[in-house]
């Protein structure tokens, strides 16, 4: 037991290691490129399926051939070691080939959300000084406008139909006529590949400093920044998940519903499964209303999503009478899941013969998406899991390297293989978040408040910037209220934000946004809010009581599919409370 007389520190005690096999605790991270690791791990499985895209299957042998063809084409287009190409696309086989091809030749992909405005895309192109742009045909005109007044010389255009089976490709092209007026610097994907037929496919030597990608932070707590993630980062995430060997097995499948322009989408949704010999089923542009049908069609053992995906599955009528015992590890990351929502999802899974509860994780772009995992039996309600086997997580006095004992709340910091190289061309911002502590390790200062229990499970309270500080100095964690409100059976989703205190010059008060279950009649809304007020009075201290409640049809989301807290704050009016 931890006592006040004998404080125990997580970075020294590492209590979570009792849940891992010694061979994984002692493993050495591979010193190779991300592409090399996938090839090594599957050298005896070349005939097995690596990727599936609307029924078209690519074996590992096909995958390797396509990566090398793409590498030659990138070289023919002028991309060389150290260069950065900008990619504006959803997830398709071509984007996966381009990722590993750029990695193979020592180049980097700058991954940009295709929903960005012309100015947004232009800023990201200029930030990394790309001379090559790869984009979807459906966003070509926006990308063309964005590329003006930049150094882009060549634009490679791909279509979602490029890898479809022939009948589907023909149907797609008929239904979605390409009306773009392409300019002289454009080359289409198949022409792009053909242009590289005489180029070398020799791989560049492994460089531990090489950044595979630049991915951009969501901007929910500040201006977006380009995060450089290396081969070691991607390989570190994949190899640490191999320690979950009771869940992950060669020959299984993973439904990839996350986009390529967030670290979670590529690190966990592509490189992790390919490294572990798990087939990736690519869904390029998810319609969340069809998620249940997709799961039933493909029956994937694994999926990485966000909490709202699983909340939707739990009420999907298409799955209500289905046996889902094929599910092994469905993980909710990217945002916190309230305890009531977690219980609802777990009740649904148990009722449909799923062996394990919803898996959860915690991380951030700057940690290559994942630092903890609550998976299989190693799962506690309300926690975000155990640190990955070769990763350290501990609580510190905010903004310092003073570690706090296990059980005490502080700023969660992360050290391990997933820690980013840094922000692109932002040394001051990098120095603010990556700090070398007295132990000599580099730690990511997350800006999140939380703690570890005696078993090493991590609990997340809130981002420091989401803390609601009252006029009297009392601090309110939004999660305290969300965990209570979400227990009400009528509440589908909830989010707590701060609003102005009308009675004091300074300070903020908690305000609750609600999305109710669709089956709840409008006539019962006032009664439900009354019940929620009473629930909070019974379970929360006086200083934590919400000042108001507002029912909305759906939660606004950021581009990374997280609840947009800033937008919710902006929409509160004095009449709401």
Question: What spans do the regions from the language model cover?
Answer:
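AMP-binding/adenylate-forming catalytic core of the ANL superfamily
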Residues: 116, 133-135, 303, 416, ...
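N-lobe entry segment of adenylate-forming
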Residues: 1-58, 62-77, 81, 162-181, ...
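AMP-binding/adenylate-forming catalytic domain of the ANL superfamily
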Residues: 158, 538-563
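Gly/Ser/Thr-rich phosphate-binding loop
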Residues: 301-305, 314-381, 392
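Conserved AMP-binding/adenylate-forming
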Residues: 53-58, 70-116, 128, 137, ...
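Conserved AMP-binding/adenylation subdomain of ANL enzymes
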Residues: 235-253, 261-304, 308, 312, ...
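Conserved pre-ATP/AMP-binding loop-to-beta segment of ANL
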Residues: 179-216, 223, 246-253
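Conserved AMP-binding A3 loop
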Residues: 59-61, 212-239
